[in-house]
Swiss-Prot record:
One of its GO terms (cellular component) is proton-transporting ATP synthase complex. Produces ATP from ADP in the presence of a proton gradient across the membrane. The gamma chain is believed to be important in regulating ATPase activity and the flow of protons through the CF(0) complex. Keywords: ATP synthesis, Cell membrane, CF(1), Hydrogen ion transport, Ion transport, Membrane, Transport. It comes from the Bacteria. This is ATP synthase gamma chain. It is a peripheral membrane protein. It is found in: Cell membrane. It comes from Ureaplasma parvum serovar 3 (strain ATCC 700970). One of its GO terms (biological process) is proton motive force-driven plasma membrane ATP synthesis. GO terms for molecular function: ATP binding; proton-transporting ATP synthase activity, rotational mechanism. Gene3D superfamilies: 3.40.1380.10, ATP synthase, gamma subunit, helix hairpin domain. Pfam families: ATP-synt (PF00231). F-type ATPases have 2 components, CF(1) - the catalytic core - and CF(0) - the membrane proton channel. CF(1) has five subunits: alpha(3), beta(3), gamma(1), delta(1), epsilon(1). CF(0) has three main subunits: a, b and c.
Length: 286
């Protein structure tokens, strides 16, 4: 290989390292912004779930929410990314989709990568809606819109269960694809131990108007939207953390490759200089 060709390789790899490092910095900034966003709504979500738990504790039976003769299939709201270069983030989500989503189930895909996966796997007919997941799209209003569409299918008996597939953020390097059962209610998950005293007071002192059953029905859209909104933000945090880690690894690999190319370049240049000196010496001897 010529010196010019090797120099082009070095420049190319160094340019790649600059690009991946810039992408790492962007992902880091987005990660911080989304983590701040999650922290801002965390207390609200916890309090809201406590209210739901309190309400369910005084509802003896939630069977009234089940639709008679509903089709035995599930609506999955899946959360992927719109952009690529996020390590194994989308692969892990799609792997779980392949494992648990049946041919008869319906899917709301959020994120272009999820839509593309459903299309390539021949499941595009199952997809009821498709939305991008850019930062500007990440709003409670969007979550409420999806929640109402999901609840409409549930109310019509098209599905008998609603679940969310999202990526749970554990720490900066660990993420876990998880499933949340949204409907029917999981009373054991929502009625927490710390609510015991409040529940006892509620049984005799809280009046529900028009009645507790109608109240449960009224809060369903905002309940689903709240769960979905939290899942969207947590998935976005996991996506940006995964992309930051991937770009960090790519930058380090590119820099290491550039160093190796420099060694090869220096070896080639030294060999060329040695040959030139040898030729000069040989010519002077003649």
């Amino acid at each position: 290989m010529s010196l010019d060709a090797m120099k082009r390789k070095i420049n190319s790899v160094q340019t790649t390292a600059k690009i991946t490092n810039a992408m790492k910095l962007v992902a880091t900034a987005k990660l911080k912004r989304q983590r701040d966003r999650l922290a801002a709504i965390k207390e609200y979500c916890h309090d809201y779930y406590d209210v739901i738990g309190l309400l369910l504790s005084v509802v003896d039976d939630v069977e009234f929410l089940k639709i008679p003769n509903a089709k035995d299939r599930t609506l999955y709201i899946t959360i992927n990314s719109t952009m690529g270069l996020a390590g194994s983030y989308n692969y892990n989500v799609n792997k779980l989709i392949s494992k648990i989503v049946n041919e008869t189930d319906i899917t709301f895909t959020i994120g272009k990568k999820g839509h593309d996966f459903m299309r390539l796997s021949g499941r595009v007919d199952q997809v009821n809606t498709y939305l991008n997941l850019n930062d500007n799209d990440l709003t409670f209003d969007m979550s409420l819109q999806i929640a109402r569409e999901a609840l409409e299918l549930y109310s019509q008996g098209e599905v008998n269960k609603i679940c969310i597939i999202y990526t749970k953020f554990i720490n900066a390097i660990t993420f876990e694809v998880s499933v949340i059962d949204v409907l029917p209610f999981d009373k054991t998950a929502l009625i927490k131990d710390h609510l015991a005293e409040t529940i006892e007071l509620a049984k005799d002192n809280i009046i529900f108007k028009p009645n507790k059953f109608e109240l449960v029905k009224k809060i369903l859209p905002t309940y689903i939207a709240t769960v979905l909104y939290g899942s969207l933000i947590e998935s976005k945090i996991s996506e940006n953390a995964s992309r930051r880690n991937a770009m960090d690894a790519a930058t380090k690999n590119a820099k290491a490759l550039a160093e190796n190319y420099k060694l090869i370049y220096n070896t080639l240049r030294q060999g060329k200089i040695t040959r030139e000196i040898t030729e000069i010496v040989a010519g002077s001897d003649d």
